[in-house]
C-alpha cells in the first residue's frame, strides 16, 4: 500500500467518525472530552491524520459502541492444515423435487 492509499483509508475513517459524532449530535468539544483527547486530536482524527495514537481510535470505537468492529482486525486465519482437518458440510445443490 502506498502513502496515497493509506491517506485515503484514513480520510475515509475520519469521515465516518465525524458522521457518527454528528449523528449523536455531539459537538467536537463534548465528543473529545468523552474520548479523553483534545479537540485538536479529534480534529486530526476526523481529517485522517496518520499520527493519531491507536488508543484514541479504540476509545472512539468504544464510545460509539463499535468496539466489536475490531474483532476482525488482525484475526488469525485458519492454517491450511486446520482447514483440511475441519469437518466438511455438504451443501445442497438444488431444491428438492415436489411431488
What is each model feature region?
Residues 71-99:
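Short, charged recognition helix plus adjacent turn
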Residues 25-43:
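Short alpha-helical DNA-recognition segment
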Residues 1-23, 73:
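A short, Lys/Arg-rich alpha-helix, primarily the initiator
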Residues 49-62:
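Short, basic-rich loop-to-helix N-cap that marks the start of a DNA-contacting helix
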Residues 15-30, 91-98:
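Short basic helix-loop element that most often maps to the first helix and adjoining turn
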Amino acid at each position: 500500500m502506498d502513502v496515497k492509499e493509506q491517506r485515503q483509508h484514513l480520510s475515509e475513517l475520519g469521515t465516518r467518525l465525524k458522521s457518527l459524532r454528528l449523528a449523536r449530535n455531539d459537538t467536537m468539544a463534548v465528543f473529545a472530552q468523552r474520548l479523553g483527547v483534545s479537540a485538536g486530536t479529534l480534529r486530526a482524527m476526523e481529517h485522517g491524520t496518520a499520527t493519531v495514537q491507536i488508543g484514541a481510535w479504540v476509545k472512539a470505537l468504544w464510545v460509539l459502541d463499535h468496539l466489536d468492529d475490531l474483532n476482525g482486525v488482525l484475526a488469525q486465519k485458519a492454517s491450511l492444515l486446520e482447514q483440511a482437518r475441519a469437518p466438511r458440510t455438504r451443501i445442497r445443490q438444488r431444491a428438492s423435487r415436489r411431488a
